[in-house]
Amino acid sequence: MISTNSVEFFTSIFIVCSAVIIIVLEQIFPYNKGQKIFRRGFFNDFVLYTLLQSYIAGICIFYSIRWLQAIGLQSDVHISSYLSPWQQLIVFIVVHDFYIYWFHRLQHKSRFLWRIHEVHHSSFEVDWLSGSRSHLFEILINQTVEFAPLFLLGASPEVAVYKGMTDAVWGMYIHSNINVKSGFLQYFINGPEMHRWHHANQKKALDKNFSTKLAMWDWLFGTAYFPKNEKAGSYGLTKVYPLSFIQQFFYVFRSRS
């Protein structure tokens, strides 16, 4: 891996370049033609994405681990002594993805957790940025579970940043409006073909395709929905949902109707 002194610069450049490439591909090979780049809620989602998502959390934890190591507070377990940074990254990605699959399923079953999660499904357009729309509580829960093991297991500090970079780029990809065909890879690796159905509001697609990075969880546990000759027609909730971050935050606490 790249030295820890330049890891933030490299990952920042990689995310920006990935975003530009995905946006260009959305315009050249759109799944839903005519979908605008600056659609409803774009700037709000961009702020959420920039300030609150996994990459920024990864940088914070990167420096936290380095600081804790500098003052002598280290985990008794040192996974970095047994695995290279790349091996650590793969282990954490697979284990965290397995957790996310089951937690995601629970979010769709639990009335309380759905209130927190429904903001993620509120966008009527699914594109490279819509995946960033998440309630603050969901972000805190997921990123605590995501990054705490890195410190508890004594991971290399840069692994947190690379993990955040992977999450950011993959999140942009699976939500992108690109008419991509992954072929047999879609049975193992998640892509836009399956994940856009997760955001579709057609009844037959509800509570399907919970995987984030590894589509194999859906195929293994019977939640895969992948109609090859159908097109996802519309997305979002069937009710009006607020667009601003503040309104979305407090909407969770509304009285039950």
In which residue ranges do the predicted regions lie?
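Short, strongly hydrophobic alpha-helical membrane anchors
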Residues: 1-8
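Membrane-interface helix-loop junction between the first two transmembrane segments
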Residues: 24-42
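Membrane-embedded catalytic scaffold of the fatty acid hydroxylase/desaturase
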Residues: 48-59, 65, 82-237
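A transmembrane-helix-recognition feature enriched in membrane-embedded lipid enzymes
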Residues: 27, 46, 212-220, 248-256
